[in-house]
Every structure is written in structure tokens, then in C-alpha cells.
Amino acid sequence: MENKNKLDLIDGPKDIIETAGNLLGKGHEIVDTISEYSPYIRLANNLMNKRREQKCENFLKGLAMKVFSRENLTSDDLQELNRLIEKNTNMTLILDILEEATKTVSNISSKLLGVIAGQVMEGQRTFTYNEWILTNALKNMNDWDIDNFKKVYSYFEEHSEDRKVSTTCLIQNISMEEYIQMRNNSLETKDHSIQENIMNNEEFKMLKSSLMRMSNFQILSVGPVAFALDSVTFEGNQVGDELYKLIQVIERYI
């Protein structure tokens, strides 16, 4: 990866900004010579740079959680991070993760990628195919997706007997056993109004769309098809388990 121009952190003391700039100088560069002649492109570049500065700041906070066990950074901490990264044998990989963090939809994702980079720095994580699946998913998940992902795994914690969950179960906060009973009652009475009302609700539609999206990212797996109006079920998987652990790491600092 080529060395890049500096990206200064925003909303921080001057010395922190300057120190962070030394580290982020190896990050992503957005320079278009056309911007010198076009005020529109210059404005767009400035706005895009500010967005990436915020992403880098969140990445560093996640990195600090792992390396220093705290989120807030001093200028000395930033200098130490810079030193640790430069001498780390995985420096290129860490900078690749930083590059992905600047492209995330969610600021939470940038912070989670910082935690992952910290694990790489400390030799606690080796990048395999699953790690790249996780990185790609985090790059594309928005805050709504992350909240819905947490709902799924919180459900599995609350209903430990269940290995899969339907969207209806999440909306109604009922176990799969209760859901099957509701489905059987509908079949016996031929009254599907309860299920239909749930499935026609906008909250249901948005939640199911988000869950299907996450299954496309391979963060959740699609489970066995249920014989019901809401036939799609979702299961956790190894990548999802890793993501839930990472979320728990950053939530300890909230």
C-alpha cells in the first residue's frame, strides 16, 4: 500500500490532531487536481475528507479499546499507536483495514474495524476468509442493520433452546415453540388474520428486509423453511458469532 497524504482528526486538541495526522498519513488520500479549478469539486472533496476524518477517528477509538483498554486518546497514546503500527509485521494488513473503515456506512462499523485491527496488532486474530467476510459486511451494514443483528443474537441469548428465529418471533418476542403453536392454531381455525396483520406491518417488512440483507453478507444464515406464512428463518453462524463478540467489546465503553 502506498504512503498517503495526511488526514487530520477533527474535534480534537491541536497536538492530538497533529499526532494522529502522522499515523493517518498512511491512510486513504483524496486529492483531485481538478478541484483546483472547480469550486464544486473542491467543496465535494472537502466534504468527503471530513467524512473520512470522522471514520478514521472512530477507527482509532476502536483500536485504542483493544490496545489501551480505553476509548479516549491522548497525544502520547497516538504517538504510541503510530510507533506500534510502524513496527508491526502486519502493518500493511492494519492499513488495509483502516482503508475499509473509511468506506463504512456506519460509524459503529468503523470502530468495530478498529477493534479488529487491534486484535491483529496483538497477534490475536489471523485473517482468513471469514475475517474478510466480516470486514466486507461491516463496510456495508448501516446502524439499522447492526441494531437488528443485535436483536437476533439477543433473542438467542434469551431463548437458548432455539437455534433459529423467524421475523415474527423477533417482532412479537416469542419463542419458536410459541410461534409454532400460533401457526398451528391458525391452521386449525383457518384464521390467518393474526399472522397477516403482523406481516403487513411496516416494522415487520423493514426488519425482514434487513435480516435478508445480512444473510446476503453471510453474517446470518437462512435456516430451514417453516410451514407458515412467515416461512423464512434465520440462524447464527461463525462470522456472526465473531461480530457479536466485537459489539460486546465496544459496548463495554459506552
Label for each model-derived stretch:
Residues 1-8, 202-203, 232:
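Terminal, membrane-proximal amphipathic helices
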Residues 6-11, 24-26, 38, 68-72, ...:
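Short, flexible coil/linker elements and helix-boundary hinge sites characteristic
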Residues 103, 107-254:
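Long, helix-rich, hydrophobic modules that act as membrane-proximal anchors or helical bundle/coiled-coil regulators
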Residues 2-66:
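Membrane-inserting effector segments that mediate pore formation, membrane fusion
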Residues 7, 31-34, 81-85, 149, ...:
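Extended hydrophobic/Leu-rich segments
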